[in-house]
Amino acid sequence: MESIFHEKQEGSLCAQHCLNNLLQGEYFSPVELSSIAHQLDEEERLRMAEGGVTSEDYRTFLQQPSGNMDDSGFFSIQVISNALKVWGLELILFNSPEYQRLRIDPINERSFICNYKEHWFTVRKLGKQWFNLNSLLTGPELISDTYLALFLAQLQQEGYSIFVVKGDLPDCEADQLLQMIKVQQMHRPKLIGEELAHLKEQSALKADLERVLEAADGSGIFDEDEDDLQRALAISRQEIDMEDEEADLRRAIQLSMQGSSRSMCENSPQTSSPDLSSEELRRRREAYFEKQQQQQQEVDRPGPLSYPRERPTTSSGGRRSDQGGDAVSEEDMLRAAVTMSLETAKDNLKAERKK
């Protein structure tokens, strides 16, 4: 592909690019094409003068600008046709009745010149392959034999005029090289405007990225991924909620213990300790159950006589009655303490929730 001559668009000099891409070299310049255009203008003036230099048509012709060129660099089909005659080449309209009667397969031709409004470009066969040498492209575009007819038909549908170039084109390096090898094109060339827009977009994105990196370096904070940031925030919120729940639970337990302590102080005998911890309550319950078991064992154990030994009613009986009273009072006290502890914990927790 590097051996193919391809002039890219400059201004409105597409006619010059079309001819040079066709001939595969810098054969024509704007000055040479302008000279051909002036010759055509002079020939047209002479023909108009044949009707009389004083005629209205002649004066109108002189006032009109040239139809073969303009200041932008545009050149007419007549200029292109005359330029090709220097090389013995001729242009024939592709869709003319004369050419269509010949029924020539497009792949058997050597080159085409295509025109739409003021734009010209060449489609040429180099070696055994066809190439679109449009100067608006960033490079030559490979066209397969099967796609060539469809490509030309598409151009006609879009309003292009297509001319067949007849004659022997000058030899060129690309044609000789591609006679021996075939090229493959992995990526089609883009239009120059698209390439410039793509480069500008990349430049803008690069500038934005650099600004973001500079800002990140200045602040010391850079979030590589927005999703990671959202997940981190969600986890942080969950941890805060868990901490709040744990704090509520600790306050409820503390209030429960305070309430149970107050209840036990109010309901316990004055001889007991003013503050009973949970450990003390547990020890008292164990002592109560052990005493109950010992009493049951004494009742069930048989004595040396068939009747139980009598005991003084005043002392021993009084002591047994006191022990039973102490046991009952301790049992009631434990039950009441546990019940009041649970109720107090519930009430305190509800009050804390309302706050």
Swiss-Prot record:
Membrane disposition: Peripheral membrane protein
Source species, domain of life: Eukaryota
Class of the enzyme per the UniProt entry, highest EC level: hydrolase
Biased composition (Basic and acidic residues): 279-289, 344-355
GO biological process: actin cytoskeleton organization; cellular response to amino acid starvation; cellular response to heat; cellular response to misfolded protein; exploration behavior; intermediate filament cytoskeleton organization; microtubule cytoskeleton organization; monoubiquitinated protein deubiquitination
Pfam families on file: Josephin (PF02099), SUIM_assoc (PF16619), UIM (PF02809)
Enzymatic reactions: Thiol-dependent hydrolysis of ester, thioester, amide, peptide and isopeptide bonds formed by the C-terminal Gly of ubiquitin (a 76-residue protein attached to proteins as an intracellular targeting signal)
Compositional bias annotation for Polar residues: 257-275
Annotated EC: 3.4.19.12
Recorded GO MF terms: ATPase binding; cysteine-type deubiquitinase activity; identical protein binding; K48-linked deubiquitinase activity; K63-linked deubiquitinase activity; ubiquitin protein ligase binding
Swiss-Prot/TrEMBL keywords: Hydrolase, Isopeptide bond, Lysosome, Membrane, Nucleus, Phosphoprotein, Protease, Repeat, Thiol protease, Transcription, Transcription regulation, Ubl conjugation, Ubl conjugation pathway
Phosphoserine modification, residue list: 219, 268, 272-273, 321
Database matches in PROSITE patterns: JOSEPHIN, UIM
Domain Josephin: 1-180
PANTHER family, A to Z: ATAXIN-3-RELATED (PTHR14159:SF0)
Domain notes: The UIM domains bind ubiquitin and interact with various E3 ubiquitin-protein ligase, such as STUB1/CHIP. They are essential to limit the length of ubiquitin chains.
Function, in words: Deubiquitinating enzyme involved in protein homeostasis maintenance, transcription, cytoskeleton regulation, myogenesis and degradation of misfolded chaperone substrates. Binds long polyubiquitin chains and trims them, while it has weak or no activity against chains of 4 or less ubiquitins. Involved in degradation of misfolded chaperone substrates via its interaction with STUB1/CHIP: recruited to monoubiquitinated STUB1/CHIP, and restricts the length of ubiquitin chain attached to STUB1/CHIP substrates and preventing further chain extension.
Protein name in the entry: Ataxin-3
Organism (species): Mus musculus (Mouse)
